[in-house]
């Protein structure tokens, strides 16, 4: 039977519930347990797919094509379990489902209320998402006291009571601030946060106390006394120089032992040697490169969370410190390519909308003409094709129909039809809804032998995740290829261009898929690893 660890946060947001939860999950997995994780988001959007990257950050795409919270990316980077659409749901998704059932008459005329109908649906989805895991960690988004979180907190209160104390526990993250003028940490915010939880019927079993200063034993003892939590279950989690230290920090304080004993689980001791190797490679690099990352959401780097982590993983794999130089593509439009000078490689990630696109195209041209290693992802591939059409073929009006529907040479256009993962044919028009209408999830891709991308992966067929509506226009593709554009990857049926490369360039690869979603600190990713190797070669050449 599945055991549940419910994870909540108090005092302030952005305490790192996702990292702490994933780190505990990693330790339990290292003890031989089957672990999964869920994220419950209180916002009313059905999913984050149409939310602004400036507000929400990255949309993480699962293998089965769900657009989810970026915390699921942390989950997959810390544990081996692959997340699905069942591992993340929102208030909007819950209400949408309940209202659809009400319209069908499934409730037989009953008055639909938050309790029991909404809370029952939340509990049903938690149980479904947990599946047959030994332990399921369920993270509740937001902060205790928020009105939006109340149905979720009530649902976990009920579920905790229904399955019993031997199968459910509550881990609460709080902030223990350091007051510089007093020269000490303060426990009062934690006490009040727990008081808020207890007022709605939830007593924490574990407190993870976040701080930027050490929390001494007397403070932990005081917190335990005022919150009715065992002293050994009051965990001090100070800021770390890398998040991949967190599993070791939690293990050193015995958190996994406490969980295993509480649940009565029989399992091995934790083997964290893989994480020790990751931390060692991260903190003791032998080389260093600088990569210019040209994007349009630089005001909130969480919009590129998986990509930034993937570059870190590539550095770990190559024992190389990867310095990312974040450049807003609009700054290139205004200030020119001097911003790119001195970079060992150039990375152009995905994005939507016209703003900043010309700056990305300029960055591609700089990389191609100056033989600087280039990696383009999603839109980064599309702008590479546009740049090639404009500056190699002379089609000065070349563009994507996303930016100019009247372009004389629409080298990138809307995908009007494709088969989804089930084989069903989906169609789209410019008037289609934005939500849930993209080519999403894992798709097979055939790689051309002898290509740079084939050298990276070392295989003929790969599977990568997608999130896009636009593709290279097949009607103009033959002319692009005749002019020297290398198509080194295609969809399984050969209908869609997945990877392009540039002839006579040391390393120029642009892909339509998002390889960052499958990169992990322990395994890295072959494409990013190859990119960093190319950057090292460029630096050594200079």
From Swiss-Prot:
<dbReference type="GO" id="GO:0019856">
    <property type="term" value="P:pyrimidine nucleobase biosynthetic process"/>
</dbReference>
<feature type="binding site">
    <location>
        <position position="222"/>
    </location>
    <ligand>
        <name>UTP</name>
    </ligand>
</feature>
<feature type="binding site">
    <location>
        <position position="71"/>
    </location>
    <ligand>
        <name>Mg(2+)</name>
    </ligand>
</feature>
<keyword id="KW-0479">Metal-binding</keyword>
<dbReference type="GO" id="GO:0046872">
    <property type="term" value="F:metal ion binding"/>
</dbReference>
<dbReference type="InterPro" id="IPR029062">
    <property type="entry name" value="Class_I_gatase-like"/>
</dbReference>
<dbReference type="GO" id="GO:0004359">
    <property type="term" value="F:glutaminase activity"/>
</dbReference>
<feature type="binding site">
    <location>
        <position position="13"/>
    </location>
    <ligand>
        <name>UTP</name>
    </ligand>
</feature>
<feature type="binding site">
    <location>
        <position position="222"/>
    </location>
    <ligand>
        <name>CTP</name>
    </ligand>
</feature>
<dbReference type="GO" id="GO:0044210">
    <property type="term" value="P:'de novo' CTP biosynthetic process"/>
</dbReference>
<feature type="binding site">
    <location>
        <position position="351"/>
    </location>
    <ligand>
        <name>L-glutamine</name>
    </ligand>
</feature>
<dbReference type="GO" id="GO:0005524">
    <property type="term" value="F:ATP binding"/>
</dbReference>
<keyword id="KW-0315">Glutamine amidotransferase</keyword>
<keyword id="KW-0436">Ligase</keyword>
<comment type="subunit">
    <text>Homotetramer.</text>
</comment>
<feature type="binding site">
    <location>
        <begin position="186"/>
        <end position="191"/>
    </location>
    <ligand>
        <name>UTP</name>
    </ligand>
</feature>
<feature type="binding site">
    <location>
        <position position="402"/>
    </location>
    <ligand>
        <name>L-glutamine</name>
    </ligand>
</feature>
<feature type="binding site">
    <location>
        <begin position="14"/>
        <end position="19"/>
    </location>
    <ligand>
        <name>ATP</name>
    </ligand>
</feature>
<feature type="binding site">
    <location>
        <begin position="186"/>
        <end position="191"/>
    </location>
    <ligand>
        <name>CTP</name>
    </ligand>
</feature>
<dbReference type="Pfam" id="PF06418">
    <property type="entry name" value="CTP_synth_N"/>
</dbReference>
<dbReference type="GO" id="GO:0003883">
    <property type="term" value="F:CTP synthase activity"/>
</dbReference>
<keyword id="KW-0067">ATP-binding</keyword>
<dbReference type="GO" id="GO:0005829">
    <property type="term" value="C:cytosol"/>
</dbReference>
<dbReference type="InterPro" id="IPR004468">
    <property type="entry name" value="CTP_synthase"/>
</dbReference>
<keyword id="KW-0665">Pyrimidine biosynthesis</keyword>
<dbReference type="InterPro" id="IPR033828">
    <property type="entry name" value="GATase1_CTP_Synthase"/>
</dbReference>
<dbReference type="InterPro" id="IPR017456">
    <property type="entry name" value="CTP_synthase_N"/>
</dbReference>
<feature type="active site">
    <location>
        <position position="516"/>
    </location>
</feature>
<feature type="binding site">
    <location>
        <begin position="146"/>
        <end position="148"/>
    </location>
    <ligand>
        <name>CTP</name>
    </ligand>
</feature>
<comment type="similarity">
    <text>Belongs to the CTP synthase family.</text>
</comment>
<dbReference type="GO" id="GO:0042802">
    <property type="term" value="F:identical protein binding"/>
</dbReference>
<feature type="binding site">
    <location>
        <position position="469"/>
    </location>
    <ligand>
        <name>L-glutamine</name>
    </ligand>
</feature>
<feature type="domain" description="Glutamine amidotransferase type-1">
    <location>
        <begin position="290"/>
        <end position="541"/>
    </location>
</feature>
<feature type="active site">
    <location>
        <position position="514"/>
    </location>
</feature>
<dbReference type="InterPro" id="IPR027417">
    <property type="entry name" value="P-loop_NTPase"/>
</dbReference>
<comment type="pathway">
    <text>Pyrimidine metabolism; CTP biosynthesis via de novo pathway; CTP from UDP: step 2/2.</text>
</comment>
<feature type="binding site">
    <location>
        <position position="13"/>
    </location>
    <ligand>
        <name>CTP</name>
    </ligand>
</feature>
<feature type="active site" description="Nucleophile; for glutamine hydrolysis">
    <location>
        <position position="378"/>
    </location>
</feature>
<feature type="region of interest" description="Amidoligase domain">
    <location>
        <begin position="1"/>
        <end position="265"/>
    </location>
</feature>
<comment type="function">
    <text>Catalyzes the ATP-dependent amination of UTP to CTP with either L-glutamine or ammonia as the source of nitrogen. Regulates intracellular CTP levels through interactions with the four ribonucleotide triphosphates.</text>
</comment>
<protein>
    <recommendedName>
        <fullName>CTP synthase</fullName>
        <ecNumber>6.3.4.2</ecNumber>
    </recommendedName>
</protein>
<dbReference type="InterPro" id="IPR017926">
    <property type="entry name" value="GATASE"/>
</dbReference>
């Amino acid at each position: 039977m599945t055991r549940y660890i419910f994870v909540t946060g108090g005092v302030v947001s952005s305490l790192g519930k996702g990292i702490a939860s994933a780190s505990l999950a990693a330790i339990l997995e290292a003890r031989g347990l089957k672990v999964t994780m869920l994220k419950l988001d209180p916002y009313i959007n059905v999913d984050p797919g149409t939310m602004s990257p400036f507000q929400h950050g990255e949309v993480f795409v699962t293998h089965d094509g769900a657009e989810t919270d970026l915390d699921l990316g942390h989950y997959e980077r810390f544990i081996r379990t692959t997340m699905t659409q069942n591992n993340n749901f929102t208030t909007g998704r819950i209400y949408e489902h309940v209202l659809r059932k009400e319209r069908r008459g499934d409730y037989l005329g009953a008055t639909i209320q938050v309790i029991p109908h909404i809370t029952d649906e939340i509990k049903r989805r938690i149980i479904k998402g947990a599946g047959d895991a030994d332990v399921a960690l369920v993270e509740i988004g937001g902060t205790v006291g928020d009105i939006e979180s109340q149905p979720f907190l009530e649902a976990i209160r009920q579920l905790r009571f229904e399955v019993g104390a031997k199968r459910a526990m509550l881990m609460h993250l709080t902030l223990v601030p350091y007051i510089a003028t007093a020269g000490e940490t303060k426990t009062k915010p934690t006490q009040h946060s727990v008081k808020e939880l207890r007022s709605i019927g939830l007593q924490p079993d574990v407190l993870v106390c976040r701080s930027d200063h050490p929390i001494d034993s007397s403070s932990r003892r005081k917190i335990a006394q005022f919150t009715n939590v065992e002293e050994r279950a009051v965990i001090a989690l100070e800021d770390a120089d890398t998040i991949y230290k967190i599993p070791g920090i939690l293990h050193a304080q015995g958190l996994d032992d406490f969980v295993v004993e509480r649940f009565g689980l029989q399992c091995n001791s934790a083997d964290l040697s893989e994480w020790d190797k990751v931390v060692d490679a991260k903190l003791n690099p032998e080389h260093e490169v600088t990569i210019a990352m040209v994007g349009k959401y630089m005001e909130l780097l969480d919009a590129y969370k998986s990509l930034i982590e993937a570059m870190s993983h590539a550095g770990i794999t190559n024992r190389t410190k990867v310095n990312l130089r974040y450049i807003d593509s609009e700054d290139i439009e205004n200030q020119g390519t001097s911003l790119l000078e001195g970079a060992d490689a150039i990375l152009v990630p995905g994005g939507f909308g016209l703003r900043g696109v010309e700056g990305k195209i300029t960055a591609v041209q700089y990389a191609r003409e100056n033989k600087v290693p280039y990696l383009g992802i999603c839109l980064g591939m599309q702008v590479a094709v546009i740049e090639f059409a404009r500056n190699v073929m002379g089609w000065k009006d070349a563009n994507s129909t996303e930016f100019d529907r009247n372009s004389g040479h629409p080298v990138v256009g809307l995908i009007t039809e494709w088969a989804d993962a089930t084989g069903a044919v989906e169609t789209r028009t410019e008037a289609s809804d934005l939500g849930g209408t993209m080519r999403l999830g894992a798709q097979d891709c055939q790689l051309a032998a002898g290509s740079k991308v084939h050298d990276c992966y070392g295989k003929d067929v790969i599977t990568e995740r997608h999130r896009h509506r636009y593709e290279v226009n097949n009607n103009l593709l033959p002319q692009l290829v005749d002019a020297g554009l290398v198509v080194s990857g295609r969809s399984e049926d050969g209908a869609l261009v997945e990877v392009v490369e540039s002839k006579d360039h040391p390393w120029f690869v642009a892909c339509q898929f998002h390889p960052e979603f499958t990169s992990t600190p322990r395994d890295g990713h072959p494409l990013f690893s190859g990119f960093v190797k190319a950057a090292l070669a460029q630096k050594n050449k200079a």
